[in-house]
């Protein structure tokens, strides 16, 4: 178990987390999965970073989410995160003609065939390895822009979803490396008339999932609207390049929620509206968001006073 994995230290000055004169940072194991690459008894360990005096390092947002998930445990919050990403070879997205552009968007989303999808072998291996590790991957699909893909993790509680998303991201980068391809989480990897990359975050509390939950979801959407400018600040860097009001986004300067509207900040799924209970989809987080910060923001806004 976790108690068998020792604390560890590292040189924080090499990762821009400390000064060279006081460089030691502490790693405390908090979660682990089977290592699907090395196999046998090897494991991948997620750690929190602490200062030498035992306080959480300023780069450790998990510590705060840990507090919040205890504080709001009675809400039984579930999160499901849709992680979009883009494959590149050098300076070109995977599958794009060198120095040029592919056909306009349309045939690539959930596409099939070598003229429509690029990198499926990496995606399939990533999916298999995540499942082998015990990560709660719930789906994959080719995205709207060629060379862009998505995987989904969850639904899980706030800490579990965040830990598993970071481990799944690490595995994505590591597996793509073997193919000579790099993945990026930049929210707008190609300028112009191309979709950006997001991390749509689906959220529900126990009462939202029960009969009459739609009313509670609507109240939550209103609270998210009141806190839009505060929350958007932790929803990922360069997000303003993606949230333009085009390409299935709402402008970063606006807030709207609606049923089935992919141009809204928050989408209430059609099935949720029809059933009268379910979940909401926050479409604002960028692909490069930190799930610890996003889950904390949603918990505080929706469950707080």
Where are the model-predicted features located?
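C-terminal accessory/tail domains of diverse enzymes
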Residues: 160, 171-181, 209-305
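A generic structural signal for well-ordered coil/turn residues at beta-strand boundaries
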Residues: 4, 43, 81, 147, ...
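Short acidic (Asp/Glu) and glycine-rich catalytic loops that position anionic groups and cofactors
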Residues: 43, 195-206, 270-278
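A generic structural motif
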Residues: 49-55, 114-115, 155-161, 205-210, ...
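Histidine-centered divalent-metal-coordination microenvironment in nucleic-acid enzymes
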Residues: 84-96, 142-156, 186-206
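ATP/Mg2+-dependent ligation/transfer catalytic cores
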Residues: 1-142, 164, 181, 219, ...
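Short, contiguous, pocket-lining structural segments
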Residues: 114-122, 139-145, 157-168, 172, ...
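Short, well-ordered alpha-helical packing segments
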Residues: 69, 84-86, 127, 169, ...
């Amino acid at each position: 178990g976790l108690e068998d994995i020792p604390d560890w230290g590292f040189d924080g000055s090499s990762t821009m987390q400390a000064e060279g004169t006081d460089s030691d940072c502490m790693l405390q194991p908090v979660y682990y999965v089977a290592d699907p690459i090395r196999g046998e008894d090897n494991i991948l360990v997620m750690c929190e970073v602490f200062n030498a005096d035992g306080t959480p390092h300023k780069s450790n947002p998990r510590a705060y989410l840990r507090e919040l998930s205890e504080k709001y445990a009675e809400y039984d919050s579930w999160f499901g995160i849709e992680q979009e990403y883009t494959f590149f070879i050098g300076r070109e997205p995977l599958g794009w003609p060198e120095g040029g552009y592919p056909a306009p968007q349309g045939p690539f989303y959930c596409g099939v065939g070598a003229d429509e999808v690029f990198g499926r072998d990496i995606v399939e291996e990533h999916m298999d390895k995540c499942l082998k590790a015990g990560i709660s991957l719930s789906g994959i699909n080719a995205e709207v822009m060629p060379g862009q893909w998505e995987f989904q993790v969850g639904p899980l509680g706030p800490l579990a979803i965040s830990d598993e998303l970071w481990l799944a991201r690490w595995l994505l980068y590591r597996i793509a490396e073997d193919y000579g391809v790099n993945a990026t989480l930049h929210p707008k990897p190609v300028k112009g008339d191309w979709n950006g990359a997001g991390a749509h975050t689906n959220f529900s509390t126990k009462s939202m999932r029960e009969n009459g939950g739609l009313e509670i979801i609507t109240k939550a959407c209103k609270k998210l609207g009141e806190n839009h400018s505060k929350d958007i600040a932790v929803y990922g860097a360069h997000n303003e390049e993606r949230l333009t009001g085009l390409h299935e986004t709402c402008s970063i300067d606006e807030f709207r929620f609606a049923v089935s509207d992919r141009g809204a900040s928050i989408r209430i799924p059609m099935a949720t509206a029809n059933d009268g209970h379910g979940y909401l989809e926050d479409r604002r987080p960028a692909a490069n968001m930190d799930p610890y910060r996003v889950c904390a923001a949603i918990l505080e806004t929706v469950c707080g006073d």
